[in-house]
Amino acid sequence: MGAVRIAPGLALLLCCPVLSSAYALVDADDVMTKEEQIFLLHRAQAQCQKRLKEVLQRPADIMESDKGWASASTSGKPKKEKASGKLYPESEEDKEVPTGSRHRGRPCLPEWDHILCWPLGAPGEVVAVPCPDYIYDFNHKGHAYRRCDRNGSWELVPGHNRTWANYSECVKFLTNETREREVFDRLGMIYTVGYSVSLASLTVAVLILAYFRRLHCTRNYIHMHLFLSFMLRAVSIFVKDAVLYSGATLDEAERLTEEELRAIAQAPPPPTAAAGYAGCRVAVTFFLYFLATNYYWILVEGLYLHSLIFMAFFSEKKYLWGFTVFGWGLPAVFVAVWVSVRATLANTGCWDLSSGNKKWIIQVPILASIVLNFILFINIVRVLATKLRETNAGRCDTRQQYRKLLKSTLVLMPLFGVHYIVFMATPYTEVSGTLWQVQMHYEMLFNSFQGFFVAIIYCFCNGEVQAEIKKSWSRWTLALDFKRKARSGSSSYSYGPMVSHTSVTNVGPRAGLGLPLSPRLLPAAAATTTATTNGHPPIPGHTKPGAPTLPATPPATAAPKDDGFLNGSCSGLDEEASAPERPPALLQEEWETVM
């Protein structure tokens, strides 16, 4: 009878086509969902069954051999390793068979066991097949093992009517994941708290900038658009998580045991109708859109500041419309292109799996915005350092200049999203171990809390915002004081000075600051004239001719002409932006507001 020698690579003969085709669909830097895993399993099963028909149609491949199967082992393992007895101990039946005749007989037929394709097995040998790449959570460096007995049948589990197989190397990530689960739980808590805090703080910041009319200017309008993009990004993340993982925990959605994989493979294929995935696809689409708009409004902030510094003729109101279209419209274009391509060429699952190179339709524009914004940041810091050296020459030491430069740079970093550049060239799937944990904690922390940092620096710590809040608070407390004293009837009021038993409060330019003027704090002549007139209290609303009056704002404490871009002053900024040239002194004032 003819003999057929199994080539060393025959163990992968049936599986390689399945692995290569499935690998084209599974993207290495995405998270596998349960629906996508089911799809890949059914696809692998169909391709395996096709290969089985081709192999079984060649009877010469499965004929009995008179010369034996001495070199037919497909395990790829040395015999001394198989004799260890840890993974695949020899049966008593095999021990009784002489070594020279162990491989004589009919081989075990190839088959699909609902997880992977098993090739022809040499009788009396253990067959090892690499763990399939199309099962996302498997250890792809391990092997699965089966034993082919001398009768040409796959060995059964004692006491059970099922084939024995050892998947322990493949599922080691599934059986020992306590520490990994702790890491993922901690990362989930970080980004949940971070986006929640950012959403709350940004909501307050937008309400403040929208409420006070004195804060309405081009720069603050751009800030409000940026704040809104951060808010929508946080909301879209929460909605996406709720939709994708509704009805199942993260464990159930992404972690499948060996028995669950078998049950899934035996079930009918998942429905391919788009209506079944409409909700999650809409959630994923809006998440990608708001993610892209957030990156592009960060770029708009950089372009605006760069234009103020380097463009002599810059109409802020005119460019605001262009910035608005750029920030909200351009991301809509490439996200719409991605949706069209995905719906046409890879309309599977919830679209949260990128399906190969189609992800670059969205990722390339986002990466381009990050790189461009980083270039703008470097150029602006260079100009800032030059102005600091020119302005402070001879007035402060070098260490003080460096401290000012460092402070200004740190203030600009959240606005420009500089932290994105750190791990931009290192996808998280290309690293492992401690470096992977460092990268993930870094990105989750800064990405989720970036909105909070931006709201703190550019709204809550803004000098003009604080002044407007103080004025509003003073007016509110003053109105309450009016009502309280009016009900008590202890004083009379008019549009002149307010007269009380202890002080005189001028309802004038300084009233907005809520500063009561005590006679003890006034000059002697002013205190005498203001407090009494010929020993009598002054008449409300009456001012004696020639009486000395306090200036509205002391010259020594006069506010600077322009509080600057970074400090948030809107006064005079729009008018001065259209000037032919921006004076160097004014530019320096804009930068020194952060020092």
Curated annotation (Swiss-Prot):
The modification Phosphothreonine is found at residue 553. Pfam families: 7tm_2 (PF00002), HRM (PF02793). N-glycosylated. The chain crosses the membrane at residues 189-209, 224-244, 295-315, 319-339, 361-381, 405-425, 440-460. Residues 66-103, 528-595 are annotated as: Disordered. Residues 29-188, 245-294, 340-360, 426-439 are extracellular. Residues 210-223, 316-318, 382-404, 461-595 are cytoplasmic. Keywords: Cell membrane, Disulfide bond, G-protein coupled receptor, Glycoprotein, Membrane, Phosphoprotein, Receptor, Signal, Transducer, Transmembrane, Transmembrane helix. It is a multi-pass membrane protein. GO terms for molecular function: G protein-coupled peptide receptor activity; parathyroid hormone receptor activity; peptide hormone binding; protein homodimerization activity. G-protein-coupled receptor for parathyroid hormone (PTH) and for parathyroid hormone-related peptide (PTHLH). Ligand binding causes a conformation change that triggers signaling via guanine nucleotide-binding proteins (G proteins) and modulates the activity of downstream effectors, such as adenylate cyclase (cAMP). PTH1R is coupled to G(s) G alpha proteins and mediates activation of adenylate cyclase activity. PTHLH dissociates from PTH1R more rapidly than PTH; as consequence, the cAMP response induced by PTHLH decays faster than the response induced by PTH. This is Parathyroid hormone/parathyroid hormone-related peptide receptor.
